Amino acid sequence: MPHAEKGLTVGLFGGSFNPPHAGHALVAEIALRRLALDQLWWMVTPGNPLKSTRELAPLAERLQLSEQIARNPKIKVTAFEAAHHVRYTADTLALVKARNPGVDFVWIMGADSLRDFHRWQRWREIVLTFPIAVIDRPGATLSFLSSVVAKTFDYARIDEGDAPLLARMRAPAWTFIHGPRSSLSSSAIRKMAKG
């Protein structure tokens, strides 16, 4: 797990990154800038419990490719979930919080992930524990509004203009961040690679 000093603001950007691409790097850069973060931990997960592992590239390969794409020195690429045998995001976030007292974290996710977020194990616990930044993705700008999470926690949504304050806010708190979007997707890249 990367190190963060007390008082820092750190974004947590997790995913299978199968494969990582410039769109992921764009999300990371937008989050760093718009949330005024000191660091961003790019967390390459061993696998997504909601997705098939049939086409999942080896973790070492996804980790190496992520390091090549994430060039900003504020971005720390890690696969600590595998070392700690953590499978679910709620467990990962609990571990991160327990090991880093005094650090202000914000969970970062693409708007496309918000659609199914209510299917994640202990999703309410995640929302009630960590501020969340939802970054715009092509085709997901409007659908996020109808998501279970957006409806359930509409009262906790903060204005996008207040995004730099999010990491220091007490959960539940979340925002939707508009910005440049990349049409790249890992599933489309895998499909093209198959021919």
From Swiss-Prot:
Residue runs in coiled coils: none
EC main group: transferase
S-S pairs: none
Pathway(s) the chain acts in: Cofactor biosynthesis; NAD(+) biosynthesis; deamido-NAD(+) from nicotinate D-ribonucleotide: step 1/1
Keyword terms: ATP-binding, NAD, Nucleotide-binding, Nucleotidyltransferase, Pyridine nucleotide biosynthesis, Transferase
Pfam families: CTP_transf_like
Domain of life, per lineage: Bacteria
E.C. code: 2.7.7.18
GO molecular function, one term: ATP binding
CDD domains: NMNAT
One of the protein's GO biological processes: NAD biosynthetic process
Catalytic activity of the protein: nicotinate beta-D-ribonucleotide + ATP + H(+) = deamido-NAD(+) + diphosphate
Family the UniProt entry places it in: Belongs to the NadD family.
Job description of the protein: Catalyzes the reversible adenylation of nicotinate mononucleotide (NaMN) to nicotinic acid adenine dinucleotide (NaAD).
Protein name (database record): Probable nicotinate-nucleotide adenylyltransferase
